[in-house]
């Protein structure tokens, strides 16, 4: 707990989230190696973003945080075209994977009040940045 408290900003930095955040770079790889069956990784949070990745030539997609936050995410996305991940992109799960089981902060029973407060602050900062950048 002390380590996360001291190094939390390094492990779980405040970064504005953008759907399909690696698409621009991924398309450069696709252009350089058009016959290679790349898996798209990065910011697939809805049926719309999944479809965009596939339309851009990626035969497979990877979903991490969306499924970590809701293990039934793919089924919900199949039945509701507008369904979007409830992940708040606080990066808590990333920091946690190096010390404990990787979990979304929403589902952790052992999260401390201090970490809850830190996650809320990160979410507020991310939300502010995302609105400023026009991502929301």
Model features per residue range: what roles?
Residues 1-136:
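Flavin-dependent oxidoreductase catalytic cores
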């Amino acid at each position: 707990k002390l380590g996360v408290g001291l190094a939390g900003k390094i492990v779980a930095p405040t970064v504005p989230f953008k759907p399909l955040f690696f698409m621009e770079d991924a398309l450069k790889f696709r252009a350089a190696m058009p016959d290679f069956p790349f898996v798209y990784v990065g910011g697939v949070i809805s049926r719309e973003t999944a479809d965009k990745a596939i339309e851009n030539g990626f035969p497979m997609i990877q979903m991490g945080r969306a499924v970590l936050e809701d293990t039934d995410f793919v089924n919900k996305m199949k039945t509701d075209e507008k369904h979007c991940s409830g992940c708040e992109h606080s990066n808590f799960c990333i920091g946690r994977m190096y010390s404990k089981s990787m979990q979304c902060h929403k589902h952790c029973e052992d999260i401390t009040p201090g970490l809850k407060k830190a996650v809320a602050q990160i979410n507020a900062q991310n939300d502010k940045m995302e609105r400023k950048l026009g991502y929301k």
